[in-house]
Regions:
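Predominantly a Rossmann-like dinucleotide-binding segment in NAD(P)-dependent oxidoreductases
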Residues: 14-17, 22-104, 109-111, 247
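Rossmann-fold NAD(P)-binding glycine/threonine-rich loop
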Residues: 1-15
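C-terminal glycine/acidic-rich active-site capping loop/insertion
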Residues: 21, 115, 138-228
Length: 253
């Protein structure tokens, strides 16, 4: 269905913007830009587990009437992976578990995806009152030239709740590491910290999506790669769910 919509937009000469909020988030755009400079292949590790209770658990149960977390949540981070690699996904393996009787589907899942440039990605998503908040927000990319990570508050600092919607895209800081070493096998560069404390809130990011659509129309921006990444990310998470359901690795044509 997504591919059909993209094809229709191309045929009609219309602008189609994929509604993934991370695409217009300044800090995430910088995260992607830094990852693209790490060389190939890339190793991409991203998760978002949400320990939900009260209203958030009601929202999650409602969502799981039609989608699993690895599809609903995972598609955003897999889309980031597609932008980082610029490569074609070729193989997906998914695994999941049903940790509650309150839903008919698995409320936990993770996937592994391979790209045709040798890059690999891992994504994990789980929802519910049983989920751990240990390492619930991992956003980490490694390449031959180093690594870049999104760093969130650690123990002893300001606590970030896993079911806080605003925290799902919040970066706090980027940690950039260079792998360059000298003749004594010592690192040449110190790690670089990029503070992202002034990033826009959730509503401001939604506003940026609308602004980008208007810009795409007014400036006739070529959205070919933008749309293809959106289709590829959806293909990956749907393939992951198929893999979970069948127990088989899914190869993408």
């Amino acid at each position: 269905d997504a591919q059909e919509i993209v094809d229709m937009a191309k045929a009609a000469g219309k602008k189609l913007v994929i509604g993934y909020i991370l695409r217009v988030h300044p800090a995430w755009m910088e995260f992607i830009r830094r990852a693209q400079g790490l060389g190939k292949p890339l190793v991409m590790r991203m998760n978002l587990n949400q320990q939900s209770s009260g209203d958030p658990w009601i929202w999650h149960r409602n969502l799981m009437q039609s989608l699993t977390p690895i599809v609903d949540c995972g598609v955003h981070y897999v889309d980031v992976m597609c932008q980082m690699t610029g490569a074609k996904p070729v193989k997906v393996h998914g695994m999941g578990a049903k940790l509650t009787d309150a839903t008919k589907v698995q409320n936990y899942g993770h996937l592994h995806v391979e790209f045709d440039d040798g890059s690999v990605g891992w994504n994990e998503a789980g929802w519910g009152p049983m989920m751990s908040e240990t390492a619930f927000f991992v956003k980490d990319v490694v390449g031959p030239k180093g690594s870049v990570s999104i760093v969130v508050p650690q123990d002893g600092e300001t606590h970030t709740s896993s079911d806080d919607i605003d925290s799902h895209t919040k970066t706090n800081a980027l940690l950039c590491h260079s792998s360059e070493i000298d003749e004594n096998n010592q690192f040449v560069h110190e790690d670089e910290w990029i503070n992202m404390a002034d990033e826009p809130d959730h509503q401001a990011r939604c506003d940026r999506e609308q602004e980008y659509l208007l810009k795409a129309i007014n400036e006739d921006i070529d959205l070919t790669e933008h749309m293809q990444n959106g289709v590829d990310s959806l293909r990956i998470v749907i393939a992951a769910q198929e893999s979970i359901d069948t127990g088989e690795i899914v190869r993408l044509d």
